[in-house]
Amino acid sequence: MNRCWALFLSLCCYLRLVSAEGDPIPEELYEMLSDHSIRSFDDLQRLLHGDSLDEDGAELDLNLTRSHSGGELESLSRGRRSLGSPTVAEPAVIAECKTRTEVSEISRRLIDRTNANFLVWPPCVEVQRCSGCCNNRNVQCRPTQVQDRKVQVKKIEIVRKKKIFKKATVTLVDHLACRCETVMARAVTRTPGSSQEQRAARTPQTRVTIRTVRVRRPPKGKHRKFKHTHDKTALKETLGA
């Protein structure tokens, strides 16, 4: 019993010393001391360590939130700087004339042109083709050496709703070497009358046949009064009179 009282007095002295030196003592601690829950020095240590752990946890959470918020703000500021600041453009490099890997489609015409009721597998393969640009517009990248390569594909026929697998051979063309070659333009010689002749040759001619239809008029009959007169001179004199 005396030990408990001594413990209680030492705790009160410690609390007063702490309140005088630092922050005020919370009222929750007084309530826990007034209660009979503290019966030994171990209970007091648990109480003090529990409060310190809670405070340390709160400080740790606060530090973490500050660090996260600071990191997010820093990342946002970096993002704004990167968006706002102009990016450094790298120099352009010409695509030189050389062989490159391209994708070529295997159509059904390469296997069988008479039948369309089948599938080809694989539908496309890789080939080597010349590509690139040259220094002049009059020069193009063209292959100087080619090689035929045979590949085996599957021909899947559908007969009476059943699949029949067959093998077929397709010949592919690979480019081995490339070079920029001059494009030869066709020489066009023009003569003074050639332009009109070329235009006449280009424009399609349509033949138009015109048929003249003669309409037969009924013969002019003489007046009944002058039927008996056959002499034209006498008839003219009679009409003139």
Curated annotation (Swiss-Prot):
Q: Which family does it belong to?
A: Belongs to the PDGF/VEGF growth factor family.
Localization, per the record, is:
Secreted
GO MF term set:
growth factor activity; platelet-derived growth factor receptor binding; protein homodimerization activity; superoxide-generating NADPH oxidase activator activity
Its annotated function is as follows:
Growth factor that plays an essential role in the regulation of embryonic development, cell proliferation, cell migration, survival and chemotaxis. Potent mitogen for cells of mesenchymal origin. Required for normal proliferation and recruitment of pericytes and vascular smooth muscle cells in the central nervous system, skin, lung, heart and placenta. Required for normal blood vessel development, and for normal development of kidney glomeruli. Plays an important role in wound healing. Signaling is modulated by the formation of heterodimers with PDGFA.
Q: Where is this region: Disordered?
A: 217-241
Main subcellular location: secreted
UniProt organism field = Ovis aries
Signal peptide bounds: 1-20
- The protein's name in its UniProt record: Platelet-derived growth factor subunit B
Q: Which Pfam families does the entry mention? A: PDGF, PDGF_N
Which gene is the coding source of this polypeptide chain? PDGFB
Give the CC-aspect GO terms.
basolateral plasma membrane; cell surface; cytoplasm; extracellular space
Alphabetized UniProt keyword annotations? Cleavage on pair of basic residues, Developmental protein, Disulfide bond, Glycoprotein, Growth factor, Mitogen, Proto-oncogene, Secreted, Signal
User: For site (Involved in receptor binding), what residue positions does UniProt give?
Assistant: 108, 111
In this chain, composition skew of type Basic residues spans: 217-230
